[in-house]
């Protein structure tokens, strides 16, 4: 299949290329709606946290309104974050084969147009955020500092994945705050577990570009870990499982629900172990496939939390 004009190298043949109006395609690519995996990975900690809060509150289901709001907010704010990232790193993107076709470095949109689109997406996210209680609104606003500094971290540290983890895991705090108007230890443990998960999967993602990154001075855990990537993934993924387990059991599962959660967590851990076994860091296609499978891992955990809540 011949890529559509202006399509991004690692996301060809998607709905944006095939059915979206031509004028909208650069903007949809700018917000990464041609590659929704990032929105899912931002959304899932929100859903985990909402489900965990419903367990702690003894409710059978999370509030449907919050589930929908988090869905809309995750796609809007991930789009805004991606737009900001592309604006900041546009010169670096232009020097990397996989990212040179992105809308700004390829000339499909100007920086001013991208900034205007960023503002539209940010306002949509703000509209969603204002639907929550005051504590949650303040918590959401606080996350902006992390989002702003993340694109610059690739130039100064081999651990930008930690900063990404802080940003992408923020939903693990938001769901609990949305339910209770405060933060408690289960939410903090869930947040820490999600950060460890993000560091793992984004290390996998970063292996796609490690050769280009090394040439132009972009740093990442993929370059730092190198051939030690698999044992390091085992450490971070293992930490994620332990921390999420602690969060779950502190949320006071029922006897039957505790069994369901333990079984679900075992499936989640098995999926992470499968990723490590399947991973071939020398193959960009393999890295992308394994990275994308984390949506399934996150949905497994969410399903288990929902089932436990329903058993109360």
Task: Annotate each predicted stretch with a short phrase.
Residues 2-27, 82-109, 203-226, 278-286:
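Cytosolic, membrane-interface loops and tails of multi-pass inner-membrane proteins
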Residues 20-25, 242, 246-312:
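Extended hydrophobic alpha-helices typical of membrane-associated regions
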Residues 28-29, 102-189, 271-280:
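Intramembrane alpha-helical segments
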Residues 32-42:
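Membrane-interface helix starts
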Residues 40-50, 103, 164-179, 224-227, ...:
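Small-residue-rich segments of transmembrane alpha-helices in multi-pass membrane proteins
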Residues 46-88, 98, 122-130, 137-148, ...:
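Membrane-embedded alpha-helical segments that form the functional core of polytopic membrane enzymes
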Residues 51-52, 130-132, 153, 177-178, ...:
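Helix-loop junctions at the membrane-solvent interface of multi-pass transporters
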Residues 67-74, 90-140, 215-262, 303-304:
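Multi-pass membrane catalytic core of lipid/isoprenoid biosynthesis enzymes
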